[in-house]
Amino acid sequence: MRTPASVREATRDLRLRLPVIVMDGAALYDMEKKRYLHACVLPRELALRCEAVFRVQGIHCFLNGVLDDNLMIYYGEFHHETERAIFEKLRTSPYRNYVSRSYYKDCPIVYLMGIDLTERMQALYDALGEAGLLEQVKVRFYPAAEYPGYSYLKIYERSASREAMLERLKQDLGMERSVVLTTQEGCGDVVIRGGANQAVKRLGRLFEPYLWEQK
């Protein structure tokens, strides 16, 4: 699921009125106020233990945290060109703050992310299991569509989920019912073909002007 930065970029022509669920359900972000309303933060010691497994496996780890309502992405020494390509593509965004790992101190970490050849990421996943960490966190391990042969592995706080954050949002807004738009079968109420950009357009046709104002 997208970060606030990628949501902003995908919906640049809209001014969303309602908070958005981001980071695979690990955070709730108010686009108008530019504030994180809720975040499922990884305990510091647990996050660093997971990072240590990345390091032992020779896989670079991006630490993604929230500090004073800013997305902070701590990075170390890149091990291959795919990591560098991602960094170069995203680092110019005004909504992302890339900082050298050597400056990391106490920023609350929302998730860890790595990308490498799929077989290496499988070895990382297995190593996390051997270290007894898989039972303590939520892991997403999936192919990188834009980089064939590579896969992502992301680690979140164990309770993080889109469903749980949606329930929290409904409580905050005093809502009883929600409609989930999705690009995948079986994952929501309304299936939209054509990816995230088509989802944004369909959302506009279905619910404007209830959810936002046109810029």
Predicted regions and their residues:
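Conserved acidic, metal-coordinating active-site core of Asp-based
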Residues: 69-181
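Mg2+-dependent phosphoryl-transfer enzymes with acidic/Ser/Thr/Gly-rich catalytic loops
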Residues: 154-215
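Short, polar loop motifs at secondary-structure junctions
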Residues: 2, 25, 143, 183-187
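Phosphate- and divalent-cation-binding pockets in alpha/beta enzyme and binding domains
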Residues: 5-9, 123, 165, 202
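Structural signal for conserved beta-strand scaffold positions within catalytic alpha/beta enzyme cores
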Residues: 22, 63, 141, 157, ...
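Short, conserved active-site loop motifs that form the nucleotide-linked donor/cofactor pocket
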Residues: 18, 137-138, 189
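Short, charged, surface-exposed secondary-structure boundary motifs
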Residues: 29-33, 149-150, 199-206
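Active-site phosphate-binding/coordination module
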Residues: 1-84
